[in-house]
Amino acid sequence: MQLTIPQKLIDLAHAAPFPLYLVGGAVRDALAGLTCSQDWDICAPCDAERFSKLAADNGFTVNGTYKNTGTVNLSDGKHKFEFTSFRTDVYRRGEHAPEKIVFTDDIETDARRRDFKCNAVYYDLRSEKIEDPLGGVSDIENRCISTTRAADEVFSEDGLRLMRLARLSAQLGFTPDLECIFGAKFNAALIAKISAERIFAELQLILHADEKYGRKYAHYEGLKLLEGTDILNYILPELAVGKGMPQRKDFHDHDVLEHSFRACKYSDSRIRLTALLHDTGKPAVYAETGKYHGHDVAGEKIVRQILERLKAPKKTIDTAARLTLLHMYDLDGKARESKIRTFIVKNYDVYPLLLLLKQADYSGCKDDLNVCPGILKWDRIFAQMQQENVPFTLRQLAVRGNSLNFVPANQRAQILKSLLLFCACDGSRNRTDTLLREAARLSEEHQSGGKA
């Protein structure tokens, strides 16, 4: 077992008059031969105030002591640690925070309050021995996940454990046992008791599960487990309803839900969330028209509703909704070059992300990892625009707002945007004299009742 422990923590363990243990991710990862987690969780049969004083006396910075939960946050200047007293927790059904905490000196009692056996293996920092009260080492060796008690009991206590199961399984490549699966499925509705912010944070971790230990497509495995345990029905019902909805066989090998999963599977990490949600408009428009046409427009609104419900950051919401609206443009490859040039300039700020989404969408149709043909066309046009020095932003225009003193102040912003589009099809137009003439024409047209 390769476990590199900060020396100050080892020194603290030798100074303590009680055994001090490392527990959780760091021990699990070391035993599994994975890159050691930097989550330094420590515990002992000792109350928080006593431990806090001991840590401070041994050169640690104590950032918070919470005697009601038996928790101490501390740092050695390089690493952060969280200490928790041995305890057992009593929950109100499904809620993340325990309703009652009872402290104990028994390591097995402490182990049984935890979620999974693989997270309930202790490393004695003084004796350098493993303490395994529940058989977690065997689970780690066999790369499986089982609960510390009856699965129904563990999941009924804390609804967030439902998503944590999917995340850990995906990140680690560990397989949940059947009791675990059935226990999660039976309690899936309890995810509704967890705050939207926590659900979104856990979803993001699942969508980036491949980044934790470098397991390719780990995020896809996590999503499939959310589906298999019915949790998807509660956190993303607009997505889950796509299960079983067929699509044209000449374009798709998968139903709407599986296509969304596969688009996410093959997507760049920057657009995972959008790739997952980009077709959520399909079930809605199909229910109204029996067709999928217009699902991009409906999807923009639905994606916005989903992410607002999950209290995602505003920028995340706006970007995902906008990319969803744009993802069908020129799908058939028939758009004229002039139209594509204008489209690129209008959407230049999200253009790289849109190409990533288009590629993910293409790959998710028939698991084809070749470059999407439409992207080859767009790349050629974009490269030509760059060669022509087409301006893509207002800062790249040869004129500024203060150059348009002959234009009413309330028109200048719109005129500048129109000038940008004016240059889209011909970069040579980006000259001061040419743009000033065009600005004068647009202003006159606007004042005479036309639109710039």
Residue map of PLM features:
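Catalytic cores of the polymerase beta-like nucleotidyltransferase superfamily
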Residues: 1-452
